[in-house]
């Protein structure tokens, strides 16, 4: 209760988008409330006296309305001190009877106050029943349906309806819902939005009454209305809730209700079509129609996208003959604009991003292509081990694929790819647009083929990959030559895109080296076998290159001809360093020339050539060649001897020393001139590090640190003695980051020591970035990470900054996918429980190791307590969390790569550790599960028809986790669980339960022993069982994506209502009045009926003033559907009866 409710006339109050204000009012009786809003203590006796006195005053006929208004406001104040009227010995019915007359009086201020009192004294179901037994609902509905001049009254009426809805929606009267429907359908009314929202909530709480009153149909209609664009998603959530379970699904008309949403998608053939010979007025009218139709088409498209982002939506749309097929058929619309919008929607559905340039997508790839991996790219290196975890989004995408393919998506994309060839008479602009659409459809088709290869079983993949319709049109000479040519082009583009996609992937999960030094500039092997072969053959040929050829190539570089580096052929230099110079003989001969000397001379800091260049993409070719040259030299003893005392290395060491000396002993502030001179000497001051190539000297040092000979050179020149303090300099985060990301950590030594120092830097930012870099090192497969990296991560758990600690915990969680890292972590015994729920989640990983389980069993009953916790609550919390994560990740805003505060990727939904799943990974853990009989408990729950859906879903996930390990699968095999789960997935009346069961089946499908059983039931998995995906072999013969047939029970005509016989009254005039009131419900007869009713009221005013006829009118309003204007007209006709001395007489 807010202060604005304390008096009918106090200050301003608001509801939704509606704000009201009333004049001030002073109460004649002091309220039981002080100025600070704190209740003044009063005994129950005094409270009872106050209440009874106010009720007595309300019943007193001689008192003025102003006095009675004061007592109505006083009752509101008194309620703040009265938790329950019955405790005072006062019946709520007594109060409602005293207040009831005031909501049927002409002054709206009095009506508003009466409504407020009623609302305040509604606290339980009994109160609601007592109130409704007094038939006040008709007058509350009238107050709700008043015009804009009665907003305070309408707000109080709406609040009463919401209060009843929240207390017990099963008691909701029909007249309330009818009133809400009439307002929600009238967009000119200020309350239409809030009434629609109430209607949506009632549809969830009490779908039966909403359906009988037309509320659910109103919700469906509003989905496509541009006026309700802001709440469209809420409306669709309501619809999905109703579709989910058999008990609520019966209130939605099979197929026809969903087709309200789908209709605009395929009924828009006339949009944009110009009328020949039409007048300007007709053209303007057509433009307006097209605008409205386009808005509905867009709303329909968005609605379908929202539906498809849920399992309930996919199953419901696939069950409807026109569901997903309507979405696919939009690709065949004649309007190019609609084709493109439809294509973009399908890109969004499958979470596929369009390339920045469609045209360049199909360009040829060069075998000699090289790539630049900056430090930012390195941070986003994909996980080497994450692919082993179950990504729930892959299950979702696999079902989307088979459902859309079954509904003709591939044929639709092929049609779009050949669209230009199928049309004559197109303008140049249309042809250009169509060509773009054709290329986009080819990209999407290629992406789907690529996706299906990973997510679909081989049998389904084979049918898809052959593309029979496209291939047939490409090779058939009976078809139009243009179509054949277009099909050939599409086939070529598909091949090109598929090839380019694999060859341009910079990194993959098989990467086994840290990308430092020269490795930053090489194409990663294993991405493209064709390019790998080309490189191997080329390297062998260059290795065995004869001396004459080699000497000629050396000359062609121009290095021996001129000292001007701009005239050198840097590409040829790079090729020589990568190839022939790896041959010791060629290297030995070259070192006798000035080739290597001039390259290293160019790199000397003091030369001010390389060191002062701008740090640009174009200039990175120099550091690329420099790193490869250093790598070649430290790979051979002769190169080592040449490099160990080279001036370039000495000058790099001096450069580091200058920077270190400056920061340790900065010049006095008075000597500004000397400071400027020293600043010019410094190549590593912040500005130069940011803007010049001097920063790349650290990359070269990283190359040297990757090899024992290189490390010896660094030690010989005391470079590590300079790097260590530079990495810890306060205020030089740039140097810390450069040093950290440049050094090589594959060799145990000073590099790892420096990284450890950086991890304990005084700068929070540096510590965070260093911890994040440990994730990169883990993913890149750096040598012996488990032996040193895990310990560093455990050290970071104690960081004072919560973000650093959370990040290290997240990286440790990922590291534990590697058994060796998990074993090291178990030995370190970190205190993970102090880190809250994420820490406990990581601790659960210990259960999957015999050693870890043994440790936890000795930890003061941790396992037993956790087991009990998971049985009572955590199982349910877990399933809610993962399903919410799936729902959230399907939101468009997170379809692109994002990083969470803990540094983790949100590009997938990976299953977190589950207590029973981790326990089942060891033999001892399985013994504990068997001893506690928990598996049998889960089986009983999923078979119990009276069990809650949440408990069933939680049990399904627990079964899936237990059955996903080799040891745990024994439980599945013993109890014939697979048959039970497939039965639920295919036949459950609860669609949400099917989706959870689908996930559980996917978990178990990673066990090879289970595959024959799945095959016997008509289900199969992709070749890679680690994908944890299980799909029906034939979707048409499976009921997995089909809603069971049901009988619609939402029609009001099929249910008994309070109705009137045709001759209800003995007086024919009254019967005629009632007949015309009934005709107002039809827009066909409404105009004539309203004229006749006006005529009859003038002629027989007394017939409109009795409570008897008012009762009959309320029955009609409660039975039939009237528009808001008609309802207000009816209330005005019978206002005398409504405001009579006893309007409740015949209602009672």
From Swiss-Prot:
It comes from Dictyostelium discoideum. Changing residue 917 to D: Temperature-sensitive phenotype and defective G protein-linked adenylyl cyclase activation. Regulates cell growth, chemotaxis, signal relay and the actin cytoskeleton. Required for chemoattractant receptor and G protein-mediated activation of the 12 transmembrane domain adenylyl cyclase. Functions as a part of protein complex TORC2. TORC2, is presumed to be indirectly negatively modulated by rapamycin and regulates actin polarization. TORC2, but not TORC1, negatively regulates phagocytosis. This protein and dagA protein CRAC, a cytosolic regulator, are both essential for activation of the enzyme adenylyl cyclase. This protein and CRAC do not function redundantly. It is found in: Cytoplasm. GO terms for molecular function: adenylate cyclase activator activity; guanyl-nucleotide exchange factor activity. It comes from the Eukaryota. It holds the Pfam family RICTOR_N. Keywords: Cytoplasm, Developmental protein, Guanine-nucleotide releasing factor. This is Protein pianissimo A. SMART domains: RasGEF_N_2 (SM01303), RICTOR_M (SM01307), RICTOR_N (SM01308), RICTOR_V (SM01310). InterPro entries: ARM-type_fold, Pianissimo_fam, Pianissimo_N, Rictor_IV, RICTOR_M, RICTOR_V. The keyword Cytoplasm applies. GO terms for biological process: aggregation involved in sorocarp development; chemotaxis; chemotaxis to cAMP; establishment of cell polarity; G protein-coupled chemorepellent receptor signaling pathway; mitotic cytokinesis; negative regulation of asexual reproduction; negative regulation of phagocytosis. Residues 803-914 form the N-terminal Ras-GEF domain. Part of a complex, TORC2, consisting of tor, lst8, piaA and ripA. Additional proteins, such as 14-3-3 and heat-shock proteins, may also belong to the TORC2 complex. Disruption phenotype: Cells are unable to aggregate on bacterial lawns and show impaired chemotaxis, rounded morphology and lack polarity. Phosphorylations of endogenous pkbA/PKB substrates greatly reduced including loss of phosphorylation at 'Thr-470' in endogenous pkgB. In null cells neither chemoattractant stimulation of intact cells nor guanosine gamma thio-phosphate treatment of lysates activates the enzyme adenylyl cyclase. Constitutive expression of piaA reverses these defects. dagA and piaA double mutants require both proteins for reconstitution and activation of adenylyl cyclase. SUPFAM superfamilies: ARM repeat. Its main location: cytoplasm. One of its GO terms (cellular component) is cytosol. Residues 1-41 are annotated as: Disordered. The keyword Cytoplasm applies. Residues 1-34 have a biased composition (Low complexity). Belongs to the RICTOR family.
């Amino acid at each position: 209760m807010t202060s604005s409710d304390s008096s009918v006339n106090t200050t301003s109050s608001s509801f939704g988008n509606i704000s009201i204000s009333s004049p001030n009012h002073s109460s004649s009786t002091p309220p039981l409330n002080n100025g600070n809003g704190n209740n003044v203590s009063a005994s129950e006796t005094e409270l009872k006296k106050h209440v009874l006195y106010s009720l007595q005053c309300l019943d007193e006929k001689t008192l003025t309305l102003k006095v009675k208004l004061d007592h109505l406001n006083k009752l509101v104040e008194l309620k703040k001190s009265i938790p329950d009227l019955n405790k005072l010995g006062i019946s709520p019915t007594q109060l409602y009877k005293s207040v009831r007359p005031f909501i049927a009086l002409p002054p709206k201020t009095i009506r508003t106050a009466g409504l407020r009192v009623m609302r305040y004294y509604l606290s339980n179901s009994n109160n609601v029943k007592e109130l409704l037994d007094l038939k006040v609902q008709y007058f509350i509905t009238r107050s709700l349906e008043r015009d804009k001049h009665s907003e305070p009254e309408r707000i109080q009426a709406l609040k009463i309806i919401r209060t009843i809805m929240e207390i017990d929606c099963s008691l909701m009267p029909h007249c309330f819902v009818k009133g809400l429907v009439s307002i929600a359908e009238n967009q000119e009314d200020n309350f239409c939005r809030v009434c629609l929202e109430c209607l949506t909530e009632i549809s969830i709480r009490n779908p039966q009454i909403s359906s009988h009153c037309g509320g659910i149909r109103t919700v469906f209609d509003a989905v496509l209305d541009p006026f309700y664009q802001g709440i469209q998603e809420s409306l669709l959530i309501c619809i999905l809730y109703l579709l989910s379970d058999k008990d609520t699904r019966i209130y939605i008309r099979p197929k026809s209700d969903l087709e309200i949403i789908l209709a605009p998608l395929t009924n828009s053939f006339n949009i944009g079509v110009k009328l020949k010979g039409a007048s300007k007025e007709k053209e303007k009218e057509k433009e307006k129609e097209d605008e409205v139709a386009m808005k509905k088409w867009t709303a329909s498209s968005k609605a379908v996208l929202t539906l498809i982002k849920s399992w309930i939506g996919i199953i419901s749309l696939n069950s409807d003959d026109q569901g997903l097929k309507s979405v696919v058929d939009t690709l065949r619309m004649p309007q190019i604009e609609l084709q493109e919008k439809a294509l973009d929607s399908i890109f969004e559905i499958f979470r596929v991003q369009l390339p920045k340039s469609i045209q360049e997508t199909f360009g040829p790839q060069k075998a000699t292509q090289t790539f630049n991996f900056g430090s930012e790219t390195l941070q986003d290196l994909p996980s080497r081990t994450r692919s082993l975890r179950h990504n729930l989004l892959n299950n979702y995408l696999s079902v989307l694929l088979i459902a859309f393919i079954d509904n003709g998506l591939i044929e639709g994309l092929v049609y779009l790819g050949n669209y230009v060839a199928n049309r004559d008479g197109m303008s140049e602009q249309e042809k250009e647009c169509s060509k773009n659409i054709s290329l986009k459809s080819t990209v999407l088709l290629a992406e789907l083929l690529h996706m299906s290869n990973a997510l679909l079983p081989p049998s389904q993949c084979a049918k898809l990959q052959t593309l029979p319709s496209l291939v047939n049109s490409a090779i058939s000479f009976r078809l139009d030559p243009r179509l054949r040519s277009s099909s050939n082009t599409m086939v070529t583009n598909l091949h090109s895109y598929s090839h380019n996609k694999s060859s341009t992937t910079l990194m993959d999960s098989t990467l086994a080296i840290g990308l430092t030094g020269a490795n930053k500039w090489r194409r990663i092997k294993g991405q493209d076998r064709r390019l790998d072969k080309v490189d191997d053959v080329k390297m062998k040929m260059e290795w065995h290159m004869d001396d004459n050829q080699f000497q000629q190539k050396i000359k062609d570089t121009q290095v021996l001809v001129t000292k001007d580096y701009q005239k050198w052929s840097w590409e040829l230099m790079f090729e020589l360093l990568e190839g022939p110079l790896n041959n010791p003989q060629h290297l030995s001969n070259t070192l006798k020339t000035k080739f290597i000397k001039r390259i290293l001379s160019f790199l000397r800091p003091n030369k001010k050539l390389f060191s002062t260049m701008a740090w640009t993409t174009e200039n990175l070719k120099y550091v690329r060649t420099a790193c490869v040259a250093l790598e070649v030299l430290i790979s051979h003893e002769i190169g080592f001897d040449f490099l160990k005392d080279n001036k370039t290395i000495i000058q790099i060491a001096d450069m580091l020393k200058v920077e270190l000396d400056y920061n340790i002993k900065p010049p006095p502030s008075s000597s500004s001139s000397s400071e400027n001179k020293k600043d010019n000497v410094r190549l590593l001051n912040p500005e130069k590090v940011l803007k010049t190539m001097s920063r790349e000297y650290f990359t070269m040092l990283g190359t040297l640190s990757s090899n024992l000979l290189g490390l010896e050179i660094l030690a010989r020149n005391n470079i590590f003695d300079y790097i260590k303090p530079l990495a810890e300099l306060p205020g030089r985060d740039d140097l810390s980051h450069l040093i950290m990301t440049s050094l090589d950590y594959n060799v145990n030594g000073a590099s790892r020591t420096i990284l450890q120092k950086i991890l304990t830097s005084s700068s929070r930012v540096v510590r965070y970035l260093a911890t994040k870099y440990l994730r990169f090192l883990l993913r890149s497969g750096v040598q012996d990470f488990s032996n040193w990296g895990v310990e560093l991560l455990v050290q970071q758990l104690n960081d004072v900054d919560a973000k650093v600690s959370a990040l290290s915990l997240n990286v440790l969680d990922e590291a534990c996918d590697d058994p060796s890292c998990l074993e090291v972590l178990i030995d370190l015994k970190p205190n993970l429980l102090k880190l809250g729920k994420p820490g406990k989640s990581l601790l659960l990983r210990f259960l999957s190791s015999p050693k870890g389980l043994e440790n936890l069993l000795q930890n003061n009953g941790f396992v037993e307590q956790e087991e009990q916790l998971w049985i009572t609550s955590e199982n349910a919390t877990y399933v809610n969390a993962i399903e919410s994560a799936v729902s959230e990740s399907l939101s468009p805003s997170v379809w692109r790569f994002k990083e969470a505060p803990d540094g983790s990727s949100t590009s997938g939904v990976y299953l977190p550790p589950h207590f029973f799943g981790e326990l089942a990974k060891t033999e001892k853990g399985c013994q504990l599960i068997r001893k506690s009989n928990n598996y049998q408990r889960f089986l009983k729950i999923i078979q119990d028809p009276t069990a809650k859906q949440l408990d069933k879903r939680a049990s399904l996930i627990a079964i899936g986790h237990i059955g996903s390990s080799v040891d745990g699968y024994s439980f599945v095999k013993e109890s014939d669980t697979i048959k039970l789960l497939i039965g639920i997935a295919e036949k459950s009346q609860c669609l949400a339960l099917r989706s959870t069961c689908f996930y559980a089946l996917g978990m178990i499908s990673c066990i090879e022993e289970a595959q024959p059983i799945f095959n016997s039931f008509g289900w199969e998995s992709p070749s890679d069982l680690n994908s944890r995906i299980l799909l029906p072999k034939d979707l048409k013969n499976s009921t997995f994506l089909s809603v069971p047939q049901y009988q619609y029970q939402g029609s009001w005509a099929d249910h008994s209502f309070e109705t009137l016989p045709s001759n209800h009254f003995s007086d024919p005039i009254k019967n005629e009045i009632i007949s015309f009131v009934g005709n107002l419900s039809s827009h066909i007869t409404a105009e004539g009926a309203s004229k006749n009713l006006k005529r009859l009221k003038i002629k027989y005013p007394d017939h409109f003033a009795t409570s008897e006829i008012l009762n009959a009118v309320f029955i009609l309003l409660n039975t039939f559907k009237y528009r808001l204007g008609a309802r207000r007209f009816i209330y005005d006709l019978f206002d005398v009866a409504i405001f009579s001395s006893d309007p409740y007489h015949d209602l009672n």
